[in-house]
């Protein structure tokens, strides 16, 4: 069984792989970047799909819990990579999403 810290790190890594896999095609299509960026984008999305299989919970529960982490990581990406300041609404929304994710992920098993 994975520890809580390892599961959290796996969720974050999974989110980064998905975001990179979607951000690179966006750069090609919207920002005029070179088409070769589509190759690492495809690899990143394949990594994302594989990482989802490493999560210890049932697939649907993993996807539901992952959504909260994805929101938080996407907002971190917005701030760090895109340089867009976060609003208090962004932070509040991420906190709510992470709270919901915690309810799903940390429920009693048995």
UniProtKB/Swiss-Prot annotation:
Organism (species): Burkholderia mallei (strain ATCC 23344)
Keywords, ordered alphabetically: Cell inner membrane, Cell membrane, Membrane, Transmembrane, Transmembrane helix
Protein name: UPF0060 membrane protein BMA0761
GO CC annotation terms, alphabetical: plasma membrane
Compartment(s) of residence: Cell inner membrane
Entry membrane topology: Multi-pass membrane protein
Ranges that cross the membrane: 9-29, 34-54, 64-84, 86-106
Family according to the record: Belongs to the UPF0060 family.
Top-level taxon: Bacteria
InterPro entries: UPF0060
Heme listed as a keyword: no
Presence of the UniProt keyword Cell inner membrane in the record: yes
